[in-house]
């Protein structure tokens, strides 16, 4: 464990508070006109998923847990959760549905992801910045609708909705940014 000042806590950090591990969801520093500056932190307890809000003076010491980011390859999903394998040591890790969150829609078999590990437990998952998916369904283009840079709604092969340029049709493979589900470019494969 490393002691850090509260004002240096950022989203994604893992903190040890009273012997329990928490993942930081949001952290904001407030400097009121009167009084001492404070850091407001919203966290999720790793063990049971309970959300907690804490307020510390910005100079107060908090314990940050050691977290290691390791590359893992996605294998499959079953009733236990999502199975990943370390391509170097061949160790397998199961990630639960709560840790996975909304990112599960973008998982593809064999995809390399970064898992944040603490004592053999996966705390968080980072997908690649871009994934290539096929357009399953999109609306036809309305002729003459070129006055503004128009995008049309589309449904990807994984069921996620996004906006694509008018020249993209169903069956076209496109590159999508996983962070905000936005269209990047037409796939070059």
UniProtKB/Swiss-Prot annotation:
What species is this protein from? Rhizobium rhizogenes (strain K84 / ATCC BAA-868) (Agrobacterium radiobacter)
Q: Which InterPro entries has this protein been placed in?
A: Elong-fact-P_C, NA-bd_OB-fold, Rib_uL2_dom2, Transl_elong_fac_P/YeiP, Transl_elong_KOW-like, Transl_elong_P/YeiP_cen, Transl_elong_P/YeiP_CS, Transl_elongation_fac_P
Please name one Pfam family that this protein belongs to: EFP_N
The cross-references to SUPFAM superfamilies, in alphabetical order and at most eight, read: Nucleic acid-binding proteins (SSF50249), Translation proteins SH3-like domain (SSF50104)
Q: Source organism's superkingdom?
A: Bacteria
> What does the function comment of this entry state?
Involved in peptide bond synthesis. Stimulates efficient translation and peptide-bond synthesis on native or reconstituted 70S ribosomes in vitro. Probably functions indirectly by altering the affinity of the ribosome for aminoacyl-tRNA, thus increasing their reactivity as acceptors for peptidyl transferase.
Q: Where in the cell is it found?
A: Cytoplasm
Q: Name one GO molecular function term.
A: translation elongation factor activity
- State any GO BP term from the record: peptide biosynthetic process
Biochemical pathway? Protein biosynthesis; polypeptide chain elongation
Q: Please tell me whether the keyword Signal is annotated for this protein.
A: no
**Annotated family:** Belongs to the elongation factor P family.
- Which PANTHER family did the record assign? ELONGATION FACTOR P (PTHR30053), TRANSLATION ELONGATION FACTOR KOW-LIKE DOMAIN-CONTAINING PROTEIN (PTHR30053:SF14)
* CDD domains in the record: S1_EF-P_repeat_1, S1_EF-P_repeat_2
User: Which cellular components does GO assign to this protein?
Assistant: cytoplasm
Keyword line: Cytoplasm, Elongation factor, Protein biosynthesis
Q: What is its main location?
A: cytoplasm
Q: What is this protein called?
A: Elongation factor P
């Amino acid at each position: 464990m490393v002691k850090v000042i509260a004002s240096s806590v950022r989203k994604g950090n893992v903190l040890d508070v009273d012997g329990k591990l928490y993942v930081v969801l949001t952290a904001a520093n407030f400097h009121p006109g009167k009084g001492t500056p404070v850091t407001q932190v919203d966290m999720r307890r790793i063990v049971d998923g309970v959300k907690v809000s804490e307020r510390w003076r910005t100079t107060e010491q908090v314990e940050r847990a050691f977290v290691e980011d390791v590359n893992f390859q996605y294998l499959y999903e079953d009733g236990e959760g999502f199975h990943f394998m370390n391509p170097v040591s061949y160790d397998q890790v199961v990630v639960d549905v709560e840790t996975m969150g909304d990112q599960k829609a973008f998982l593809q078999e064999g995809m390399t992801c970064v898992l944040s590990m603490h004592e053999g437990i996966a705390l968080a998952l980072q997908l690649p910045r871009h994934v290539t998916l096929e357009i399953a369904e999109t609306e036809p283009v309305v002729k003459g609708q070129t006055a503004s840079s128009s995008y049309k709604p589309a449904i990807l092969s994984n069921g996620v909705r996004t906006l694509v340029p008018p020249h993209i049709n169903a069956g076209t493979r496109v590159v999508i940014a996983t962070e905000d589900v936005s269209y990047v470019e037409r796939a070059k494969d």
